[in-house]
């Protein structure tokens, strides 16, 4: 197993308070395009691996890994998302009918994803989404439970794992969770 870690552009996208919501989503979409059109081909060339990959991350990385998996399940056959917030409103507030923000708000758009191609890919993937209930995890809980409910209603097998009240939104826990879930995937 080999990991490639990519820097984010969150300070220019979702966390850029001086931009409006649409422009934040646009910056994120440009980043997604970079990942799919430049980083992934580079990784495939570098490794000689041309099969599906795994997306994974913690906190904002949890959001990114899950969102890019939902957008590109042909590229990513596995996802481990830890402690993410999966609702774009957390970053931009109410967004009305902005299609670009909606597309990048997993806890919203999954409910209307009925395309058989996507659903079949999701059903054949290894999907793990984990959260704790301890300090700093509360912001992500509503979107975590919304995703869980949507996946259940769409009969998409996924492991939505909730850890205890002592499990904080912090690196010491992610260092425990990541090896645990990798082991569960036999990786």
In which residue ranges do the predicted regions lie?
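Non-catalytic cap/lid and distal C-terminal segments of serine-dependent acyl enzymes
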Residues: 1-187
């Amino acid at each position: 197993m080999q990991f490639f870690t990519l820097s984010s552009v969150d300070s220019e996208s979702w966390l850029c308070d001086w931009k409006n919501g649409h422009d934040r989503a646009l910056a994120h979409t440009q980043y997604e395009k970079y990942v799919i059109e430049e980083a992934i081909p580079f990784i495939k060339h570098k490794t000689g691996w041309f099969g599906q990959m795994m997306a994974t991350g913690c906190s904002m990385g949890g959001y990114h890994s899950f969102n890019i998996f939902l957008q590109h399940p042909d590229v990513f056959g596995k996802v481990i998302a830890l402690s993410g917030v999966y609702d774009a409103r957390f970053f931009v507030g109410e967004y009305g009918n902005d299609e670009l923000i909606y597309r990048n708000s997993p806890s919203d758009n999954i409910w209307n994803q009925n395309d058989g191609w996507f659903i079949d890919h999701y059903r054949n993937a290894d999907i793990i989404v984990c959260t704790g209930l301890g300090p700093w995890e509360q912001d992500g809980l509503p979107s975590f439970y919304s995703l869980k409910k949507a996946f259940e209603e769409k009969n998409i097998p996924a492991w939505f794992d909730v850890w205890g009240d002592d499990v904080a939104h912090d690196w010491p826990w992610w260092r425990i969770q990541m090896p645990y879930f990798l082991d569960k995937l036999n990786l």
